[in-house]
Each structure stands twice: as C-alpha cells, then as structure tokens.
Amino acid sequence: QQIGSEDGEPPQQRVTGTLVLAVFSAVLGSLQFGYNIGVINAPQKVIEQSYNETWLGRQGPNGPGSIPPGTLTTLWALSVAIFSVGGMFSSFLLGIISQWLGRKKAMLFNNTLAVLAGALMGLAKAAASYEMLILGRFLIGAYSGLASGLVPMYVGEIAPTHLRGALGTLNQLA
C-alpha cells in the first residue's frame, strides 16, 4: 500500500503486521548469538565434572584415575573457543549459501544447525561424550556466524526503503 505525500516526496509504504512479524522472527534468531557466547561460563564446574566422569568411565576400573589438569583445561578451552571457530568458518561460507539458497531458505537451513547443536549439547552428558558438547558448540557457532550475515540481508530486502536503516539495526540490538 502506498501513502501519498503532499510535499512532493515519493510515496512511502506502510508498516504491515506481516512485515513486523517477519522482521521480529528473523531478528529473534540473533538472540542465540549473545546467549551462546556467555552461557558456557556459568556451568563451568558442572561441565568440568562431567568431563572428569566421562574420562573415568572411559578408563575403566584399572585406569590411571581422574583427568589430568592440563587435559581438563585444554578440553574446557576448546569447548569455549570452538564457538568462535564455527562462527568464523560459517562466515566464510555466508555469500555462497545465501546466493545458493536465497536469504529465507538459508535462514531456515541455518535453524536446522541450531536445533542439531542444541540436541548435541543437550544429550552430551547422557551420552557421556564431551565430543558431542564440543561439536554442538561448533555448530551453534556456525549458526551464529551465518545468522549475523543472513538476518541483516533478509531484513534489508523485505524492509521498505524508508525503514531499511532502522530495521537493519535491530539485528545488533537483539
């Protein structure tokens, strides 16, 4: 729909409910980025204890004992840092994926990464596998890297010209 202008400016499109819903849905996915940067820190001791239990379970009753401190530190550092590696890796593929699938389908594909990552991280303790947690962190990092580029592109494409700048900044605010 167009709104006429009496002062000679070009007509502007109205903000519709569909536009608000589409922008809100797209930008809501960006919350995963900030959440997953910080969420790993609070349960550090619980995760380290789980790593130790997994280590002991794999060693058997005659194993050397609990996980060496250096190995635990390395596993913990990898668990935290792999998020950024996943984001960096996927950001290199952003252009290829967005051109291949289009913005909307690429965001839908990206959501499968988030679901898979959540499943891996959620089941890691039950499966006694710190590798699942690390892989899940890599995949959620890949999700975040793709979302950081796909969401602003998508919002910029669907937003009316006069609102493009304002709506484009919502990704950073989420």
Swiss-Prot record:
Gene Ontology CC annotation, any one: endomembrane system
Transmembrane segments: 20-40, 77-97, 115-135, 138-158, 167-174
Chain ranges on the Cytoplasmic side, renumbered to this chain: 1-19, 98-114, 159-166
Keywords: Cell membrane, Cytoplasm, Glycoprotein, Lipoprotein, Membrane, Palmitate, Phosphoprotein, Sugar transport, Transmembrane, Transmembrane helix, Transport, Ubl conjugation
GO MF terms, alphabetically ordered: D-glucose transmembrane transporter activity; D-glucose uniporter activity
Reaction catalysed by this enzyme: D-glucose(out) = D-glucose(in)
Cellular compartments annotated: Cell membrane; Endomembrane system; Cytoplasm, Perinuclear region
Main location: membrane
Residues in the Extracellular compartment per record: 41-76, 136-137
Reported modifications of this chain: Sumoylated.
Disulphides: none
Modified residues (Phosphoserine): 5
Keyword Coiled coil assigned: no
Family listed: Belongs to the major facilitator superfamily. Sugar transporter (TC 2.A.1.1) family. Glucose transporter subfamily.
Further remark: Insulin-stimulated phosphorylation of TBC1D4 is required for GLUT4 translocation.
Name the UniProt record assigns to this protein: Solute carrier family 2, facilitated glucose transporter member 4
Organism: Sus scrofa
